[in-house]
Each structure stands twice: as C-alpha cells, then as structure tokens.
Amino acid sequence: MKRPAIVMACLLLCAAALDACLADSPEPAKQAACAEARREKLKVLRGKADQCSTLSCWSPWLRRKWTTDKNSAKPLSEEELAAISDEYCAVLKEMLDLAPDEAKIAFEYGDALMFSGKYAEAERVYRRVHETCFAGSRRDAFKIAQSEYRIAEALFAQGFRSGAKDQLKTLVDRKLVTSRRGVEDWSAYAKASYDFLSGAVPCATELPRWTGAKAFPEPQRVEYTDDFAPLSEVSVRLVGVKRDDPRVDFLVRRLAARGIKAAIGGRCPYSVTLSIDAKAPVERSEGYTLEIGEKEATVRARDGQGVLWGVVSFIQCLSDTERAVRICRMDDWPDTARRGYLGSCIWSGCLEFTIFCKMNSVVLQDYPGDSGRDTPLNVFQCTELARQFGAFGLELYFGISNYTMGLGWAYSWAGTLSMHVERCCHFAQMGANVYYPNDDMRYPVHADDTAKGLNASDVDAPHVLALYNAVREKYPKFKMVYCPPFYWGPDSSAAYPDDREKYLKSLRILPPELDLYWTGGQVKGYNKCKRQVEWFTNLTGHRPVIFQNGTGAHNLLSYLVDETDWNGWHYPGFFENDIAAFHKNSHTPNECVQISTLGDCLWNVKGYDKRRSVERGVAFLLGEDMFSILKPGLEGLTRFDRYKYGDINADILYDDLDELRKAYETASNCWAKAVAYNPEVQVYGAYGRGVGFAARVLAAAKNPPDFLAKYAQYLAAARAEAVKETAFDKEKGDLMYLPTDMSGPQMDFYKHPNVDEYRFVKFIRGAQTVFSASEMKFECDPFPPAGDYELYVAGMDDEVEGLNDIELSVNGKVFYSGPSGFVPRKYTMKKFRIPFDCMERHNKLKIRNLGVGANANGPPYIAIAYVVLKKTGENSSR
C-alpha cells in the first residue's frame, strides 16, 4: 500500500473513533477516550501536513517549489504547487477545528493561506489567534507581537498600506520585548517596517545621543578648538554632488532634528559646502577633509563615500547642548578598506548606526523572510533596506543559511543549483548581496555525491562558482561572501571527513572578488599571527574576510562597559594590509557598543584607545553619563563569570560569599540607576542579565549540591589514572587533587579532537582571563616539614604553535616559572619540587598559565587532569 493510501486509512480510522466518542455521553472514561482519539487524529494530520509543507509554503529546509528529482533543474509547475498548497490548507484547517486553541497550528494555517495568496482569509485566522492572547489574565507578549505583525503582513498584502502601518504602530507602542535567540524579533521587525513605511529611515533614531562635539571614530589628523560657531540657519552648497544625493538629505534632516533650519542653496548666516573634488587634499579612498570655521564649513573628498564620512563628522561636531558646531579641522581616512559586522536581525537603526560608526559592509544573518517566508511586507522591508544601503554606497548581504546549512541535497543534483540561483537572484534584484554559509553544517556529504566518489572538496567550489556566475550574468554588481566548512588552521584540528588542505586549495577557482570567510577556533580565540593568515591566503588564493566570533568578555556576553583590545589580538599591518574585510559576528542591536569600538579601531588602527573608545561608544548610544553609572559595578560583576550564566560549580566552596554579595549589590544598584537614566540600556549589552546571573549564584550558594556525587563516575577514572601514573600512596601522606578539588569553574569530561582518550580536566586559560589560575589548599603535617615536597601535575597544552609557560607558587612564593613541559594533543605528567621553606602550616598552591590571551573559551590553555603532592624528606636548601 502506498504512503498516501496508508495516511488516508489512518485518518478514516481516527475519524471513526472520534465520531463514536462524540456520539456518546461525556462520561470521564469516554472523555479520556475522545481526547486520545483527537490526539491520534492530530498526529496523523500532522504527518500529512508535514508531507505537504516540504513542497509548499515556508518549510524549514526550503524545498519550496523544488522537486528532489536529481535529474531535474525545474521546479514544480504552478498547477502542482497550487494543488499541494490547497491540500496543505485543508489539512491545517481540519487540525485547527480539532484544536482551536493551538496558536502554533493557527499561525501555520495562516502562513499557508498567505503563501497561497489568500490574504483576507489569513488575516481572519491571525485575528482569531490575537483574540485569544487577551483571554484570561495572562498575557503572552511574544504571541501578541507575532499575531499583530502577521495581521500587518496580511493587510499589507491586500494593499491596505495605511491599515498595515496603523497595526504596526499599535505593536510598536506596546514596547514588548521579543528578542530571543534563534527566533524572530517581532517587535524589532515591526519598528523597522513602520519606520520604512513612514519614511523615517535613515533618521528614525536620536543618534548620536552624545559626542562631546568630536568626530568618531578617532580621526587620523585633527585639530580641535574650544570655540563654537552658532548655527540657526544653514545653507547647503553642492559642488559635484547631486541635489538628490541621500547624503545631502541626511545632513539636512539631522540639522533639523537639532532645531537648525537647513536649505539647499540660498543665503544663510552659516553655510556648509559638500564637494567632490579630484584635487581634494586626502588622496585615499573614502578620505575627506573637514574644515569648520566661524561662518562656513567645507567637506572636500575625491569620492561620494568621503563626502558621507565628512558629513557624519560634521554632525558629530555639533554641540550636544546648543545650536552650535565646534570649530576644527581634520584630514581623515580609513585604515581598513571594508569594515562591518554580521547582524542577527534587521532593526530600525541598522543603517544609521552603521553610518555613524563609519562602517561600510554589513551581513544580516536573520531578517524577515530568512526562512523563505517572503510575504509582501517582508520583501518590502528587505528591499527598502537594501535600496538605502546601496544609495549610501554601503554593502549589504543577506544570509541564506536555511538554503545551505544542513540542506540534505546533493550538490550534483541540477535542482540544487537552480534553487540556489533563484534565492540569490531574489536578493540581487533588490540590489543586495548574499552570504552563503556551509560553515559547521556541511557534512555528511549526500550519498548521491559520495557514490560518485565525490567529497565536499570536489563539489563545493564548482557549485559556488556556477552559482556566482549565473547570478552575475543577470546582476553584474552582485557580490557574495562564502563561508567554507573548514575551521581555522593550521593549528586547530581538521575535524571533518575531508582533506582540509585539498578543500581550501579547491577554492582557488573562485574569482578574487568572491570573498571567503575565515572562521573557527582561533578567530574566536582572538589572537592571530601572520603565519596563520599566510597559510589561508596561500591555500585559497584569497585574502580572508574575518568572521570574528565570541568577543564578549563574560562567557561570550558583553557587559556594555568592557574594554576590547582589538589591537592586542592582531599583529601590526593585519587590519591594513592582510585581510579583505573584517566582520564581527554579533547579536544586534545588543552588541552595538562593542561594534562601535571595532569601527573605531578599523578606521584608525594606531589611534585606537580601548578605554576612550568604549566610553564614547556608550555615550553615542545611551548618553553622556551612562558609562560612569555602570562602570563601578563591572569589576564585581566579573567575579561571577566563573559561574557561567548563574550556574554554580565547585568554585563556590572556595569563594567569599560576603564579597560576592557586596559585588552583586553594587552591580544591581548600578543597573537600577542605568535603567532610570535611559531605559534603552535594556536593549544593549548583557549587564542586566549579569546582575540576574549573580542573584542566581547567591541563591544557589545557600544550598550547594554535592559536587563529588555529581562527578563521581569521572572522578573514579581520574583517581585511578593518578594512582597508576604517580604510585600514589595515601598511607605515606600523599595528597591528590582532582578537578573538583581545584578552584576555577572550567572543568569538563573532555576529548581533544586529535586525542583518543577522554579525561576529566580543569582548564586554565590565558593570562588575560579570569580563569588564568587554579588553587589548591593543603595542610603541611608535620610542620615544619622534614623536607621538600614533590609536585606531580598531569596535563596537556593547547594546539596552537608555541607552548605555554606556567608559574607555580605556594603562599605567593614563586618556586617555578617557565615551560610547563606539557605538549599538545597528548597528556603527560611532569614533576616539580616545592622547597620546604615555602610552606606554612596551612598552604595555598597556585598554578598559573602565563600564556598571553584573553579568550575564556579557547586557546591558550592548559588542561590539568590531576595534581599529586608527595613528601620527600629531603631538604633542597642543604
């Protein structure tokens, strides 16, 4: 029996059972039977709906329209697609009749109707869900926002633009927080859609909140005075700049927002001249000269981008309190050609923020319609953003991860290429570009490819090249950045079933203008050396585009006022000469402060000052006083980093709870003041979450778990290894320390990709982290000791070239500093001698990693499996 026939038979049986239940009296037993029959019917219908959705609507893996016929490059016909969509809608309607309160089914049904072009019916379904949001006392903010945004989508699709705008305004005014990892931020999408419909973008925000009347990023050459020129009315004069240039409108609207009347041409007390001049003083691309005098200001540049950055600097030099501008002069240009970030979603201030940070390259990984949900409103929003980015001369890329990562299609199928071409053309016709990730979800390679003896290193590059050429043929200005699956190198492991160097060499067939991301362990690990960059460049024939990951100092989170040592992580010349572009992977707008500091560094590498930069970034987004409000609580809040996201570990047994409580109270008070000063602080950074983590730690510390019991199975194996490798003998007074006995939170039952054995270890990270040392306490008995102690340490070094040095001390007295003796990818045991005169009755042994690094989640590190102390009876000082 074929699958459709089986499904139909199951449906008939379930329907019969359900009808029988409904015909009888509602006794408890029969009510239960009816409920079970209803669940069974829903289960069968769910299977049928899933069958339909793989070929229609917005399914998770985007098989929309495309058959899985390996020999076909054609999609389903409109007639076939319509038939499947009609069946899908019918099944979902039946499901909703059975479960009328299931919002998930209702949203899916409404989406299916939207996909089928039945917009009015979809609106009715969405409104039905919306009504249930207000039934009872509990309000589900996420469901309210989701239903109201979808209602606006349906209205817009029917041509009711004004009605859609009003619906979006209603949602915006609710100020609901719907930012969640991995799901749509409906409130952010609503605000962006409303602002685009209102024509507010690119002036939808109040940025900059405070500049101190100085340019940002730090100019290359600048002469500031303490004098200001009054501005009441301004005439804008244009030389080589068109009247309808968006840079001109941007300046006029920004002046108007400060209460300064501005007009193009005419005679006013003050004039601003914007000039594209082949003989402008700064010869560099995007460079400009800005001169601000008592009666006039002039921006001179050799290209439109230079004019834009000169306009931005003029706006930043406006007084924060008066209608005036600082008198100054600057010659300025960027050190790094392409500067930007990977954002997590569209938000209303995306374009403005990018402009004020003088960045020019942005990738949006999540956006309305990123799963193929191309409703007219979502397409409008993406198209409008792409249009405005293009008008300002900035690069905008949309990610297509739902079409590439974990797709499950063979690259040798003709339909795979056709589907990718269609999706890329969808964005290219907007004037946007595409980010194509294979990243860490490329494997396993499809069986139809491996059956032909093909691996990813054989098929990926030709596929990407064919895709790129097909789109460029239609849209010659189209750009692409491709993220291959092989992480970093040459130091980190090649963890995928392919030859890493063969794969990277295969990318040489891609043209130089098709960019390649370079990501993985060591990019997340911050520090990069020239040898590594040359390795990638030589293999691929491309300078890398950096996909900078994991920059948050607090278990990957940013607490807003942290300093970021961008220059410390990179060698001289890296930003200026050796890369094609630098993008920071970010949760936006949450991480905008740190992104602003990156923009500062990429613009003026040598002039970057990490303290000044974060102060100005915070002020730019949140106001002059916000940094000083939050900063006093940062140090104490950092103490809680050892308890990742508020989960306690064995370190709580070593910690001072009174000090932790004081640190929490200080940070909590700072946060309360910050929210009162500017509630928008809740949008940026994770300071508030950090306060919440601290509260969880203190609550859990009142009744900590039995850590020995929690890790019992790991500890038994670790203890056996220590006994075997050191001849440990408790009867002789030997002392053993396993990861639970060592301070520091980072322990794991760990297997390095290139090491065949698992071990329970404590990680000691780089010297610039809060996890750079681990302590153990021991009693010297008898005291004074008869002689020295021997220290046995089993550990492994990280995979990065060059071994970590360590420092060993007892009670603050250093008795060893130098190479650890540990090696990469193999556990070894090393012996050290502790001089007897270092010891007291009660002692504190500390192992510190001296390896330079600030990454709390990657290299440099040493992994410690155990520590054993033995009495020697020998006195080394004699």
Which residues does each predicted region cover?
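Acidic, contiguous N-terminal accessory segments
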Residues: 23, 194-305, 313, 317-331
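Aromatic-lined carbohydrate-binding surfaces of glycoside hydrolases
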Residues: 342-516
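Beta-strand-rich ligand-recognition modules
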Residues: 751-759, 769-773, 784, 795-869
